[in-house]
Amino acid sequence: MIGTARAAADVALRTAPGMMAVFVLVMLVEAMTPIAIAWLTKLVVDDLAGGGPVAELVPLAAALAVTGVLIAVLPQVSHYLGNQMARAFTARTTAQLFTATLRFAGLKPFEDPDFHDRLRLAQSSLQSGQSIVAGSFGTIRSSITLLGMVGSLLVISPVLTGIVLLTGVPALAAQLRLSRRRASLMWEIGPTERRQMFYGSLLGTVEAAKEIRLFNSGRFFRGRMMAELQNANAAHRRMDLRELAIEGALTLMGAAVAGGGLVWAVIAARSGALSVGDVSLLIAAVAAVQGALHNLVSGIAALHQDLIMFGHYVAVTRAGSDLPVPADPRQLPRLSHGIEFSDVWFRYSDRHPWILRGVDLFIPAGRAVAIVGLNGAGKSTLVKLLCRFYDPQRGSITWDGVDIRLVRPEDLRHRLTGLFQDHMTYDMSAADNVSIGFVAARDDRERIRAAARRAGIDDKLASLPRGYDTLLTRMFFEEDEADDPEIGVQLSGGQWQRTALARAMFRGYRDLMILDEPSAGLDPEAEADVHARTRNQREGATSVLISHRLNTVRDADHIVVLEQGAIVESGTHDELMTARGRYARLFNLQAQGYVEPPQAVVS
């Protein structure tokens, strides 16, 4: 926890050192004002009761007035400075947090529910980091006020002072326990809140709107969402009841001490042991000590909770890459021989079954290799390993003899381009959706259009209301722009497929092109067109094709059939058809769908 506090302080000092110095000064003066108010009030009351000269009373009254102004103004100043520091702190920590997520070169963290919970808590703790800094100074301010008022109270009654201070011990212990419980509660209800947000997002997204209305499942999802919300609320309610019981008991204890002190002071003043000013000072001092003690205890507890929460941020930002890279990484040569999988075994964790089992595969340079198989055969996983989104548990993948684990992942991916079946549809302009494939050339509009032409989508994008500057979404319009068709448009699934293909082509020539179901979701005419365009694009280049439609891979130089994570057949289309094995059976099964009426399935 000390390391977490140091991390927060380091960020704060680097963010706004000058503003922090002013903030500290204001808070120190603010801490002294209650002490000054109490003593000046005592002196004024005693002077009035004793009938002292006006010449002595006026300066005291003026000082009391100035202090009153300060006690009214300084909180506003510190609030302003605190807000400015908080914004600067949040901006810096947000940048650092998402810089850290970019250090994860693979996909493992993003497919881990625990990491999603930690990342969510890290994002919510960005404000906690600033609270740690402000809370630390607030604790110092409360300590100064407490010490000053304790000194004042000691002058009147050491016994009462001791009793008031002793009430802070159980309060501190109770608040620390509550802070730990609050922090652990945030982690415990993380999955519940994720499910609640999931169901809520379904009810508000256009992607799910069609099915929800067709299947009349809206009430079902709403019920699921509300059930998760109620579970989270129940957990919070139990926490609130615990806080109510503990803080109520502490408040009653403090009130009893203050009431007892007041009774004693009145009796002492009646007997002449205390002056009227002493009574006023005691009343102010007891209230101030209890207030400062409460603020101190609450501040320490809040600081403790914030430190626990900010620990999630520190954990994410200090985490190393999920893919190991040697201290002296190898340079990747231009692909001239080929890529080789040697006895590759892979599973997502020790709790999962093997996805790939002893795969031996050679992808010759300048050739097209197709990978086919049923769903779950391991095709997409093989591509993930090829892109080094994961490392195999056994075996190796070499690029012209160089193990890709000895190469920086970004250097490997610089040599790749591709189109994934689950490609992204960015809520950005048409130009951005293409140029995101190679952001270094995002301002080259002619290159963008050339890539779109090769993908067969240039005419469509150019004809949009604002051409390539048209937003491909309706998410960001203002209220008065809701009916303006020029603000944003929605592309069809096939048009998005071509836009994603243009994104891959925008990268220019790369050593390896990966095409994962490049014609999925297209009509027959569009499928034939995209197939011809991708064939021209990969002519003479090394490429890997994945498709369920075997007619689109028959012209590949080499076809590999995966089944249950292992290669069961390989060869050219003609060789595999002659062998009359699994490939031939699947190919003929698909072909029959075009020439013979489908047979009824009897269950």
Regions found by a protein language model. Give the residues of each.
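C-terminal portion of ABC ATPase nucleotide-binding domains
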Residues: 466-469, 532, 540, 545-603
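ABC-fold ATPase nucleotide-binding domain signature/coupling loops
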Residues: 119, 458-499, 505, 511-515, ...
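ABC ATPase nucleotide-binding domain helical subdomain, centered on the C-loop/LSGGQ "ABC signature"
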Residues: 396-398, 431-485, 540
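Cytosolic ends of transmembrane helices, especially the final helix of ABC transmembrane type-1 domains
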Residues: 217, 285-318
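Transmembrane helix-loop-helix hairpins at lipid-water interfaces of multipass membrane proteins
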Residues: 17-74, 150-182, 256-267, 271-277
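Helix-to-loop junction immediately C-terminal to a conserved catalytic motif
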Residues: 387
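An intracellular "coupling" helix at the cytosolic face of ABC transporter transmembrane type-1 domains
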Residues: 13-14, 121-132, 191, 204, ...
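Membrane-integrated ABC transporters
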Residues: 1-34, 54-60, 111-147, 195, ...
